[in-house]
């Protein structure tokens, strides 16, 4: 499933340079196969915008080659952005109005930073729900990540996320809860997923709303669930798109915050992430941050260089397989006309015909 570089978005050339297959537009238009058009609503803050963009587009581009993929990043004007980031978005991103007019086959929605206890009080809430309501009736499936999962579940089912006693931060082992679901076809029954969140929606809350639990963890909680129809909305509380060093970057950010007295307590190590020599380096950086805080000296670290080659990615292959399955299922039910949600004969209340199997 090759990506198509249909615009001058730098991520396309970055991925091509890293060895990923990215077709030129000229080559793509001469291939006689049905393409998929995927919206990518990127709500991440400026510092993570391009990394998140690259991570999700890479996942899409890693899928089997049964179709071409046109990925359309877009954002929401209500999100607070720097001038440079606004310039980047204006230059490379699509706008929702255009995508709504031309149609999409599927939609991916990222997380976002929030400032209010209630998600409905965020400036992006109404614009986000406009996108979600349109997508529910117009795309084959919506894939929600992290905070987007909490927001969309609140909107559709009235589920309120609950604060955790401490941040769920690290890499956790999960088990497949629905081995017969097509989204989990040929997936390892046990796999890792990174989490980085302060809030949670529990199995009990999801099941009370009629959702299908797909994968969960004793330590990490529910990672994946599906809407009652089992496909039109897929919810993830973890971050399967993360790079091997994503949690490392978060940890380093917290070390700098502690050294500069922007947080009161020492940051914990992300759970189940550092091991052996990498953990020793992480603890040494923690001590250095504490000393800088006490003395007022400038804090700097070499942690990223110190642990280079010592961090394991134990989730990426499964993430690729799940996204591959998701897009394959989208391909199987979407209409040839991307302005139409499903092909003729597909039941919106049971798009994958799972009721027939019972």
Please provide the spans of the model-predicted regions.
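Cysteine-nucleophile active-site neighborhood
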Residues: 104, 109-178
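Membrane-interfacial amphipathic helices and adjacent loop/beta segments
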Residues: 77-85, 192
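Glycine-rich, highly charged phosphate/nucleotide-binding loops
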Residues: 84-103
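Generic recognition of short, well-ordered alpha-helical segments
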Residues: 51-54, 87, 119, 123
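Short aromatic-enriched loop/helix-cap "lid" or pocket-rim segments at secondary-structure transitions
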Residues: 83-86, 247-249
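Amide-donor transfer/coupling interface in amidating biosynthetic enzymes
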Residues: 1-75, 99, 103, 169-171, ...
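Short glycine/proline-rich turn/loop motifs
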Residues: 89-90, 110-116, 303-308
């Amino acid at each position: 499933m090759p990506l198509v570089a249909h615009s001058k978005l730098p991520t396309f050339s970055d991925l091509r340079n890293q060895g990923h297959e990215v077709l030129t537009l000229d080559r793509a238009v001469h291939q006689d196969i049905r393409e998929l058009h995927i919206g990518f609503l990127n709500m991440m803050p400026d510092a993570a915008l391009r990394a998140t963009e690259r991570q999700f587009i890479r996942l899409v581009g890693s899928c089997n080659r049964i179709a071409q993929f046109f990925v359309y990043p877009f954002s929401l004007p209500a999100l607070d952005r720097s001038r440079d980031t606004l310039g980047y978005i204006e230059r490379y991103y699509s706008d929702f109005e255009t995508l709504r007019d031309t149609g999409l086959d599927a939609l991916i929605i990222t997380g976002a930073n929030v400032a209010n206890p209630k998600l409905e009080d965020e400036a992006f809430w109404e614009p986000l729900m406009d996108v979600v309501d349109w997508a529910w009736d117009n795309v084959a499936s919506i894939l929600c990540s992290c905070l987007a999962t909490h927001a969309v579940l609140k909107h559709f089912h009235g589920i309120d996320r609950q604060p955790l006693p401490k941040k769920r931060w690290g890499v956790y082992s999960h088990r497949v809860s629905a081995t017969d679901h097509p989204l989990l076809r040929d997936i390892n029954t046990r796999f890792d997923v990174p989490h980085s969140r302060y809030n949670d929606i529990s199995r009990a809350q999801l099941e009370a709303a009629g959702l299908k639990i797909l994968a969960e963890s004793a330590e990490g909680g529910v990672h994946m669930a599906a809407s009652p129809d089992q496909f039109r909305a897929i919810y993830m509380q973890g971050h399967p798109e993360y790079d091997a060093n994503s949690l490392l970057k978060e940890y380093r950010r917290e070390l700098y915050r502690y050294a500069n007295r922007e947080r009161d307590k020492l940051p914990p190590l992300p759970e189940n992430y550092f091991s052996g020599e990498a953990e020793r380096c992480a603890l040494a950086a923690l001590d250095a941050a504490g000393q800088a805080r006490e003395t007022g000296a400038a804090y700097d670290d070499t942690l990223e260089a110190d642990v280079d080659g010592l961090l394991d990615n134990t989730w990426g292959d499964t993430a690729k397989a799940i996204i591959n399955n998701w897009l394959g299922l989208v391909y199987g039910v979407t209409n040839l006309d991307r302005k139409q949600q499903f092909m003729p004969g597909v039941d919106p209340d049971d798009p994958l015909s799972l009721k027939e199997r019972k």
